[in-house]
């Protein structure tokens, strides 16, 4: 089932994939990394002027990484704002996604955190560097295949 934004994008020949609706009824779309920046600009011009949040997650060990954007379309005189969730998947071996910092400035720290924790490189981000972990840290702590250095599991402590 396609939502209103998916239909609108399809009429304009913009490549995407509808992932349905989440439990709150928010439309979820998948965008390819190479199409993400241009579609982000189009969505901003269309009225999605507020980036509510950006996060990332590891889909499966050895699998894809996902960058998730929650956008809101705020208009004067409208009681219920439109919301959409955009998912951009990338391979962990070459995890590069275009940054949307120049579209929504509020994604600055959020893309940096996704880089720091999962190693997703956001192309054209002006300050893409670690934000939570020290610069000397090796690896990406939130990847499912990450092995913590000097971690020892204590089985039977008593």
Curated annotation (Swiss-Prot):
Membrane protein topology class: Peripheral membrane protein
A GO molecular-function descriptor: quinone binding
Keyword set includes Nucleotide-binding: no
Highest taxon, organism lineage: Eukaryota
Main location: plastid
Cellular compartments annotated: Plastid, Chloroplast thylakoid membrane
One Pfam family linked to the record: Complex1_30kDa
Gene Ontology cellular component terms for the protein in this record: chloroplast thylakoid membrane
GO biological process: photosynthesis, light reaction
Catalyzed reaction equations: a plastoquinone + NADH + (n+1) H(+)(in) = a plastoquinol + NAD(+) + n H(+)(out); a plastoquinone + NADPH + (n+1) H(+)(in) = a plastoquinol + NADP(+) + n H(+)(out)
EC code: 7.1.1.-
Gene3D superfamilies reported in the protein's UniProt record: NADH:ubiquinone oxidoreductase, 30kDa subunit
Keywords per UniProt: Chloroplast, Membrane, NAD, NADP, Plastid, Plastoquinone, Quinone, Thylakoid, Translocase, Transport
Quaternary assembly: NDH is composed of at least 16 different subunits, 5 of which are encoded in the nucleus.
Function: NDH shuttles electrons from NAD(P)H:plastoquinone, via FMN and iron-sulfur (Fe-S) centers, to quinones in the photosynthetic chain and possibly in a chloroplast respiratory chain. The immediate electron acceptor for the enzyme in this species is believed to be plastoquinone. Couples the redox reaction to proton translocation, and thus conserves the redox energy in a proton gradient.
Family: Belongs to the complex I 30 kDa subunit family.
Protein name: NAD(P)H-quinone oxidoreductase subunit J, chloroplastic
Organism: Aethionema grandiflorum
């Amino acid at each position: 089932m396609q939502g209103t934004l998916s239909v609108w994008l399809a009429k304009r020949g913009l490549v995407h994939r509808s992932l349905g609706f989440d439990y709150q009824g928010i439309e979820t779309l998948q965008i390819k990394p190479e199409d993400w920046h241009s579609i982000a600009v189009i969505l901003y011009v269309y009225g999605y002027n507020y980036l509510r949040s950006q996060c990332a997650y590891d889909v499966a060990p050895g699998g894809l990484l996902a960058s998730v954007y929650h956008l809101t379309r705020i208009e004067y005189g409208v009681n219920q704002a439109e919301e959409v969730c955009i998912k951009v998947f990338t391979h962990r071996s070459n995890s590069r996604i275009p940054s949307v910092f120049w579209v929504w400035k509020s994604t600055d720290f959020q893309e940096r955190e996704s880089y720091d924790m999962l190693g997703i490189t956001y192309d054209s981000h002006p300050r893409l560097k670690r934000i939570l972990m020290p610069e000397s840290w090796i690896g990406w702590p939130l990847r499912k295949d990450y092995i913590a250095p000097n971690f020892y599991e204590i089985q039977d402590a008593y």
